[in-house]
């Protein structure tokens, strides 16, 4: 009887993969705490991961999320975990975390290059798609013109409306 091929998934946070800083500073900057990059996944690194028997790499935290780093528009500090933020507070489903790129304007090209290198190393790619986990300040700077931001057309005068993307407390300002 022929044995079915087994999928072996290697999950990795690119932010941590190539980061050589071992002593972290609470709420530290990227200089203090470091940050991994897509480019850290070199052909040699990918071949070593493949040698583990890996068939798929799950790149976690790739989609742009709320952050207080200086690459793009910052989010309110009270709603961001530390400075780097949580990869589960998605700010733009159409974009890539700029902190993971060597050259921010080319971040999508750098991600596409990572996908190509991974495929060339004989593995498939998985990334997180985190529906219903969005940042309080969701804003897309990479969406197509016909796409509206989440909450853009919400009726904020109602606590709940089936056509809204978010819940609201009418008449009260969010105080953080």
Q: Where in the sequence are the language-model features?
A:
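N-terminal structural segment of carbohydrate-active enzymes
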Residues: 1-124, 132-143, 148-157, 162, ...
């Amino acid at each position: 009887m022929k044995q079915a091929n087994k999928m072996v998934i290697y999950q990795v946070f690119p932010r941590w993969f190539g980061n050589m800083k071992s002593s972290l500073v609470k709420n530290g900057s990227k200089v203090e705490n470091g940050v991994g990059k897509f480019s850290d996944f070199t052909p040699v690194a990918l071949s070593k991961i493949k040698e583990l028997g890996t068939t798929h790499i799950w790149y976690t935290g790739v989609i742009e999320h709320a952050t207080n780093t200086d690459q793009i528009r910052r989010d309110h500090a009270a709603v961001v975990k530390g400075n780097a933020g949580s990869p589960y507070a998605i700010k733009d489903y159409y974009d890539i975390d700029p902190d993971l790129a060597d050259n921010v304007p080319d971040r999508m090209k750098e991600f596409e290059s990572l996908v190509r290198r991974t495929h060339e190393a004989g593995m498939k790619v998985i990334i997180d798609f985190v529906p219903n986990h969005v940042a309080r300040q969701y804003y897309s700077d990479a969406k197509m013109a016909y796409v509206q931001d989440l909450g853009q057309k919400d009726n904020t005068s109602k606590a709940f409306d089936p056509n809204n993307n978010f819940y609201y407390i009418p008449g009260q300002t969010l105080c953080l």
